Amino acid sequence: MDDRATTSRVSVLSYGLMVLGLAVLLVSTGPGADDRQGAVESSWIRAAAADDDPPPSGKDGQETDEPILGKDFPFEGPSERWPPRDRTPFPGRYADARHQAGNSRQADEAVGRALRWLAAHQSPDGRWEAGGFHHWCDGKPSRDEQPIDGQGKPLYDVGVTGLALAAYLGAGYTNRGDHDFAKTVGRGLKYLKDVQDPEGCFGPRSTQQYAYNHAAASLAMVEAYGMTGSPIFKGTAQRAVTFITQARNPYFAWRYGIKPGDNDTSITGWMGSVAMSARTINAAAIESGKPAPLVFEDTPIVDGIRNWLDKATDMETGRVGYLQRGTGPARPAGLVDRFPPERSESMTAVGVLLRIYGREHPAKSEIIQKGVKLCLDHLPVWNVIDGSIDMAYWHFATEALHQVGGEAWATWNDALQKALVDTQRRDTDACRFLGSWDPVGPWGPDGGRVYSTAMMALCLEAPYRYERVWAGD
């Protein structure tokens, strides 16, 4: 090739790159930069199709020298500035709707403190460490020589990362916008992308409990995709959903592993929750005149869940069993006496929630009404002595009773807020305890303080996190 032609092509390429750089700079910093973020993201994705990490703009959670914890901001998300143009799958998470959800000011402030505590203890690689969260403060190694109790087990890092992200998303915070949590959420989502295997499973499968890690991580990734519509997350979310559908037992539900043959209500509650979020995302797209973005067959999953619940439910009492009808909720070895299963209706709460998601009307279903009564007979009370604290139960029952609505929901939510608002840690600062909940309960030793804080934040977000299936009926 002629040297002059080569030089000319290099010059044209250099000029083109310079113009592109100036254009990106103007888009990133000029007037209306936030509104143009989606266009920048799309062009970046086309230019780097082989590497779908978040775009290097700083708006989607990239590392910067800025501290993670910023000003002591009010409990507000970016949603006033970026109202959804289409039907959003989770409309209650936008600030205007959130304020109308009826949550108390104290509950909203508690959520804000919890999210600040979680941000303080995120690891630089984006994860939350169930057992090592205390090593980090504001994105840097902690200099605090005093121990922080509440460590969990490292094998649950992927799961508690998913729960922490779900808490941010539930309050309306994604990796986009100029709020103080954008980088926190972006780093967490990138971590999950990095630990997903080719089959779609998040994290290692070194223990049978990996299904819980996958479910929690999937919930976060699927909802992040639903809230942003970003192609950065679409493939990861699709693979996560595909793994869940392929792991389900034919005609029934889930247990540990892929189509293991047996079922349990606990992991079915988590997997079913992801499936319902995926269904909600598809329904919102269809309502906006767009094709369903996730490849997902809803009917077989709903039918399989109902088949399992019918098999596991005592039709006389409404109580749902763990592995079979008549069995109580699971407890870790050595903690059965400390946390008696009969003081929790966690499996019943899962049953109520999933039946409503399966389009059973709470006012017309006798079995749902029986389950609701059992939950109301076991209201949340922060009693560290009697072994009744079960955060997994509180989480599922809160979601279930919110779906039921009416007096049942008012009774439950009143008890829940009394149990949680005053027991949130208010001492020290966010780099130690401020904003967290002590990991009391049967699963505290596994998930630790990150688990307890994320789960209790999710409970307090329930009034606006999901729409009611039977709203208006």
Protein language model regions, located:
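Sec-dependent N-terminal signal peptides
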Residues: 5-31
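Preference for long, amphipathic alpha-helical scaffolds in soluble/luminal domains
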Residues: 29-473
